[in-house]
């Protein structure tokens, strides 16, 4: 069976999509290729790295990347994590499913917000896996 591909997209590929990529690789395992990208690149937020480190997932080697049209068109599912990404996501071919999981941006907020959003992302991916 070929691996499926999931592509997490947010505004800057800095916090939410980075954490989603980390959780996706952990939870979805070998059955999925997991990628993340942004409408823009803001660099990986150090607090996102720390939040994931707290749950023993290392995203310190991740890079902040722009949407790659090749990956986008080869994806089975594109998940937008914020309204900006949802509104500005490129047009997808008919074979690519899109879902919007609106999550609050923790950037610039208290540490507890990073933890809360991290845990919300984990729950969303666990629920997705059960479908």
From Swiss-Prot:
It catalyses: arsenate + [thioredoxin]-dithiol + H(+) = arsenite + [thioredoxin]-disulfide + H2O. The active site is at residues 10, 82, 89. Belongs to the low molecular weight phosphotyrosine protein phosphatase family. Thioredoxin-coupled ArsC subfamily. SMART domains: LMWPc (SM00226). It comes from the Bacteria. Transmembrane segments: none annotated. SUPFAM superfamilies: Phosphotyrosine protein phosphatases I (SSF52788). GO terms for cellular component: cytoplasm. This is Arsenate reductase. Keywords: Arsenical resistance, Cytoplasm, Disulfide bond, Oxidoreductase, Plasmid, Redox-active center. One of its GO terms (biological process) is response to arsenic-containing substance. Disulfide bonds join 10-82, 82-89. InterPro entries: Arsenate_reductase_ArsC, Ptyr_pPase, Ptyr_pPase_sf. Its main location: cytoplasm. HAMAP family: Arsenate_reduct. One of its GO terms (molecular function) is protein tyrosine phosphatase activity. Its EC number is 1.20.4.4. Catalyzes the reduction of arsenate [As(V)] to arsenite [As(III)]. It is found in: Cytoplasm.
């Amino acid at each position: 069976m070929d691996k499926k591909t999931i592509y997490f997209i947010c505004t800057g590929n800095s916090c939410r999509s980075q954490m989603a990529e980390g959780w996706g690789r952990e939870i979805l395992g070998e059955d999925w290729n997991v990628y993340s990208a942004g409408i823009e690149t803001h660099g990986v937020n150090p607090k996102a790295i720390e939040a994931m480190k707290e749950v023993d997932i290392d995203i310190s080697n991740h890079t902040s990347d722009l949407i790659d049209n090749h990956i986008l068109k080869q994806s089975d599912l594109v998940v937008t994590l914020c309204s900006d990404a949802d509104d500005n996501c490129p047009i997808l071919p008919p074979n690519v499913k899109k879902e919007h999981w609106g999550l609050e941006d923790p950037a610039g907020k208290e540490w507890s917000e990073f933890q809360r959003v991290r845990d919300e992302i984990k729950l969303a991916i666990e629920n997705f896996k059960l479908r």
